[in-house]
């Protein structure tokens, strides 16, 4: 059976965009049986109890950049062989990844399978995984119109991937006390932090007794 394969690993920053794309496809009538998810032990936590067909594998991650991947080249080659053999029987129509350390593996496997390969890049500066994989991609969908360090002829700007289920605010209206949270991602954190500090300077927003604010950031980014 032909399937669309979605490859996403690690934390919610990479897994949730893939899940939101999948959910939009399901809402448009795509059968869940035509979707296969490839992830790791961290990523699978976001798909538990959602009844998707999945492949879970300990893909190599690195905190030392490209050096860490070179030191684990044997494990990476093993993961490529494993994924190629696993996906071959499904005869996938395409491979789609949201980046991180699985992206280069997905790129090579897509070439071995001779199927189209697509990338979604959330940040304005592409991470190492997507940067290395972009030359293999048919299209790189971006959240920003001016995404850096990826070939311009590969980019198709589509805007950020959103969770459309959040448009129902009935529960918020029923809550007498409201807490607003601010949290930035790996590359969006500075912009969001700056916005929070600017927001805090406006005393109008702190005269409301029923509203409180929580700002999640690193200690080194905290302004006292």
Where do the PLM segments sit?
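Donor-nucleotide binding loops and adjacent catalytic segments primarily
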Residues: 38, 42-45, 50, 170-216, ...
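Active-site-proximal region of nucleotide-activated glycan assembly enzymes
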Residues: 113-168
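Short beta->alpha connector loops at strand-helix junctions that form conserved
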Residues: 56-61, 98, 120-123, 143
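Short amphipathic alpha-helix
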Residues: 14-26
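Conserved nucleotide-sugar phosphate-binding/catalytic loop shared by glycosyltransferases and other
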Residues: 4-9, 32-75
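An aromatic- and histidine-rich active-site surface loop
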Residues: 42-46, 92-113
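An amphipathic, basic-hydrophobic alpha-helix
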Residues: 65-94, 112
